[in-house]
């Protein structure tokens, strides 16, 4: 609930600031498999298989936890289904009432530095008051008290994704029902690979992570494989270059996409290209680098950012002082 609450708060601020609709997609209810850069992990002189996500093994650094267990797939499925049911109930049952979301934001800025936050909330307050005066409110307009919320994750664990794929009896098309939107990771985007082949065959909107090693000609080939009909909205290209590499690599890819007349959505993932390892061994991202990549992306163009309502170590402002 808290995760959805924060996402609704953020989307309201973005909608008000940009005067544009915001599509709300959460990496939730299914992200239980993790790509790893190495097959093993070392700690205190001991080497064990890498943690591959709760779909496969456990995070605890002990030999028993790192043994793959197929029963985890059933638990992951049950967890995903429960989460999706809750999201559906919250998003359609009044939790997303525009007035309530606005009150959450007002509570957020109450004890904080005013400035730009208060300016945005004043703008939203004026808009809501104007609509109320015109007789438009959540009580008589369902769209103001409900929200369309979509789920997403990387289509990494192919046996699981395949088991969740169904045929639409009216069209004969295949849909991966594990999420609304699935993507192909930067490590699994080989044109002749199984992940590209799987995503090519489903009708879900799909994403493709684009990193520094992706050549322009490879991108064109992948676009033609994944979206042969050049359908608008089918393919999202998710850049993850790192703060210092965006302006070096992204313009070249954008230019070749424009030249070929390909219809894609550009998105930015400023998290995974800025990963560093702190002295404690935790992977984290300096917030300054995250913000820099977002700014550089917009300087050339939606963006994706990991967020949490909990205290986390995945992103810090001063990573050098990270000690927990």
Where do the model's predicted regions map?
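Active-site-facing alpha/beta catalytic cores
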Residues: 2-242, 285, 293, 309-324
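Non-transmembrane, aqueous-exposed alpha-helical and coiled segments at domain scale
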Residues: 219, 228, 234-268, 272-313, ...
